[in-house]
Design a protein with these regions (language model features):
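N-terminal basic/disordered segments at the start of proteins
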Residues: 2-23
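Hydrophobic faces of well-ordered beta-strands that scaffold small-molecule active sites
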Residues: 3-6, 24-26, 59-63, 90-92, ...
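Active-site-proximal loop/turn and secondary-structure-junction residues that shape catalytic pockets
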Residues: 7-11, 30, 63-69, 95-97, ...
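Glycine-rich, proline-tolerant flexible connector loops at the mouths of alpha/beta enzymes
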Residues: 25-44, 63-70
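Active-site-adjacent beta->alpha loops and helix N-cap segments on the catalytic face
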Residues: 36-46, 95-104, 140-154
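N-terminal active-site wall of soluble small-molecule enzyme domains
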Residues: 51, 57, 62-126
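Catalytic alpha/beta core domains of metabolic enzymes, predominantly
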Residues: 109-247
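Conserved small/polar residues in nucleotide/adenosyl-binding loops
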Residues: 249-251
Length: 251
């Protein structure tokens, strides 16, 4: 079973390698869901890949934001550069981006991001027919659900699940609250996490919504803890957190 750790920057990548990760996932300056992380410039990725490969660790690069037309236009040179850098897999959440990656670099593995909300065998079979080698299942699934997904999915399609990390109140992050309240899209990696604010009850005025005066619990769900009982149905366990510190990666 593969242990996949986040690498929000080169320090985190080195830590993940040092403490036994089988693979790391990282984002470049565009197209990743962790826009506030340091991430990697495109010219830094070849050295990061070389370092990881020298230590027997694979590198997966995320391309999992909600894609708009301008985003799609920028994908071919993005995937070509990652291919030239020697990355092992693309993690993709949009079917259009998935198709572009297959056209540009068909020899690079394509993993379906949890943002695609794959939660059943039928969906897994469709992605497999499009060329996916792995699906990262929806974060809302129970261990029993994951076992059923493994049973119903093609045998050669790998299943990855998150074992630790934040749980969004929306289905695999498909939430518009941040966009509505702050103009920053959670589906573009800029979530302000208003589900974790505490709110003051009052009128419909925007001033009635204040993150600094607690009234009750937040809307967010606790982190998953399936790491304590790893089902054999999973090929890979992912640790969520492109923004996580070195200390968490060490643990």
């Amino acid at each position: 079973m593969e242990l996949l750790a986040p690498a929000g920057g080169m320090e985190q990548l080195r830590a993940a390698v040092a403490f036994g990760a089988d693979a790391v996932y990282l984002a470049a300056e565009r197209f990743g869901m962790r826009a506030r992380a340091a991430n990697f410039r495109m010219d830094e990725i070849p050295a990061a890949v070389a370092f990881a490969h020298d230590h027997g660790v694979k590198v997966h690069v995320t391309c999992n934001i909600l894609m708009h037309p301008d985003d799609i236009d920028g994908l071919p040179p993005f995937f070509r550069a990652l291919d030239a850098a020697g990355v092992d897999a693309f993690i993709i959440g949009d079917v259009g981006a998935f198709a572009v990656a297959g056209d540009v670099a068909p020899w690079v593995e394509r993993h379906v991001s949890t943002q695609a909300s794959v939660a059943n065998g039928a969906a897994a079979r469709v992605w497999h027919s499009l060329g996916a080698s792995r699906v990262v299942c929806a974060r809302e699934m129970s261990l029993a659900d994951i076992a059923r997904l493994r049973q119903d999915a093609p045998p050669d399609l790998e299943i990855e699940a998150f074992a630790h990390g934040a749980m969004c109140m929306a289905v695999s992050g498909r939430c518009l609250i941040s966009s509505y309240l702050t103009g920053r899209s959670g589906n573009k990696g800029h979530c302000t996490q208003p589900c974790r604010w505490s709110y003051q009850l009052g009128t419909a005025s925007p001033a009635a919504m204040r993150p600094d005066e607690p009234v009750g619990g937040d809307l967010g769900r606790p982190s998953p803890t399936s790491v304590v009982e790893l089902p054999q149905s999973e090929n890979a366990i992912g640790i969520q957190g492109g923004l996580k510190s070195l200390s968490l990666i060490h643990i």
